[in-house]
A protein has these predicted regions:
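Basic, alpha-helical nucleic-acid-contacting "clamp/cap" segments
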Residues: 123-127, 131, 161, 168-192
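N-terminal core-binding DNA-recognition domain of tyrosine site-specific recombinases/integrases
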Residues: 4-94, 110
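Basic, Lys/Arg- and aromatic-enriched nucleic-acid-binding interface segment
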Residues: 58-72, 76-78, 91, 95-155, ...
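Generic beta-structure capping elements
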Residues: 50, 105-108, 175-177
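Short clusters of hydrophobic/aromatic residues that line enzyme substrate/ligand-binding pockets
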Residues: 37, 100-103, 192
Length: 192
C-alpha cells in the first residue's frame, strides 16, 4: 500500500495505476501481503509464480475474464510490479536485495496478432452503414489511432481544410486520450 500511495501515484499514468492496483489487490496482497519483506526469498517467489497459474482470474469492472486461470502473461505483469516494488524497497533501505530479480517465470507463448489486410478494411468500409463508425475506421487505419486517442480527438486538434490538404499541411494532432478507469483510481490520482 505504501509503495502504491507514494511511488505509484506520483509515477504512473491513470490506466497503469489502475491496472497495477488491481493486480496488487487481487493477486499479491491476498497471497503474500502479510509476509515480512525480510522473509521473502527467490525460492519462495518461484513457488508463488508457479502457484499463480492455478489461481482463478478475478473479474474486474464487470468485464468477463478472457481465461479461467491466470496466464503466464499476467504472472509476468505481476512480476514486473513486484520487481519495481522491491527495487523501491531497496532504495528506501527496507531490504538489502531484491528477491524477485532471479525468480523463475513461467514461459509465455507469443501469438502473432491478426492484422487486417487492405482487402479486409475495404470490405469493412463497404458494409459499414454508420457514418460515425465509418469515420472511426478511417481514422484508426489511416492515422494508426487507438480507440482512446480517437475518442479524445476534438476539432481544435484537426486541420483538414481543403487548402491544407492541397498544400500537404493537413494534420491530426493527438494531445488527449480517453481512458476507462474506476472511481478509486480517479480519487487516488486526483492531484495529478
Amino acid at each position: 500500500d505504501e509503495y502504491m500511495s507514494i511511488y505509484g501515484v506520483n509515477t504512473w499514468a491513470m490506466s497503469t495505476y489502475e491496472s497495477r492496483r488491481g493486480l496488487a489487490r487481487n493477486y499479491i496482497t491476498p497471497i503474500i501481503g502479510d509476509m515480512l519483506l525480510s522473509d521473502i526469498t527467490p525460492r519462495m517467489m518461484d513457488k508463488y509464480y508457479r502457484d499463480l497459474l492455478s489461481v482463478k482470474t478475478v473479474s474486474v469492472n464487470n468485464r468477463k475474464p478472457t481465461s479461467e486461470y491466470l496466464t503466464p502473461h499476467t504472472v509476468r505483469e505481476i512480476h514486473k510490479l513486484l520487481r519495481s516494488a522491491f527495487n523501491q524497497a531497496v532504495r528506501w533501505e527496507l531490504i538489502s536485495r531484491n528477491p524477485v530479480l532471479n525468480a523463475t517465470l513461467p514461459k509465455e507463448e507469443h501469438k502473432e496478432r491478426d492484422i487486417w489486410t487492405a482487402e479486409t478494411l475495404s470490405k469493412a468500409m463497404e458494409v459499414c452503414d454508420d457514418p460515425i463508425l465509418s469515420l472511426a475506421l478511417n481514422l484508426a487505419f489511416s492515422c494508426s489511432l487507438r480507440i482512446g486517442e480517437m475518442l479524445g480527438l476534438t476539432w481544435d486538434c484537426i486541420d483538414i481544410a481543403p487548402q491544407s490538404i492541397e498544400n500537404g499541411s493537413a494534420y491530426i494532432f493527438v494531445n488527449k486520450e480517453l481512458q476507462r478507469v474506476t472511481r478509486g483510481a480517479l480519487d487516488d490520482l486526483s492531484d495529478k
